Amino acid sequence: MCLLGANAAGKTTTMKTIFGLVHPKSGTIEFEGKPIQNKLTGDIVTSGLALVPEARRIFPRMTVYENLEMGAFSRSNRVEVKQDMDHVCQIFPRIKERLKQIAGTMSGGEQQMLAMGRALMSRPHMVCLDEPSMGLSPILVETVFNTVLRIRDEGVTVFLVEQNASMALSLADRGYVLQTGKVVLTDTAKNLLTNDLVRQAYLGGA
């Protein structure tokens, strides 16, 4: 699923609220039928949610390998962690080539791959991606979104916040339109692609 909205509509705030970084004034937040709004961020991650934040937010002075290990901080089964490390390296071959490299010296696209890989190391049921294409070249954007499709096809739910509305809707099954913090429209992604209001506001009227 994807969340659309203009700048300052509340998309990133929505992500932060889900992960306990911003506290809602009212209402509840549920994941898999259980309330999570009063949980600590670490406990929210343990419950099956993972966040790839805007601007990636990797640990720049740590190695790529250490960054990936941080994604599995809540897990104790080292055999499974090693299996997931191998799986992440399979998804992102560039990461495998740079496991000993200091993460802050990687390119923007490589750092985005690392941030996504780190999120997968927690074995999430849902990955939340906040503006994954920001600052990337068109070729790298295509790589990132192909990876999003692969993650989805492996059975992980993807919640995508993305300025590229056309690309986001082409990947999603369902979309939500946010204005000043409120969901004003929701439908299947296919229907939103042909919705006149959505086309005018987010798809350039095409």
Residue ranges with predicted function:
Residues 1-206:
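Glycine-rich phosphate-binding loops of nucleotide-dependent enzymes
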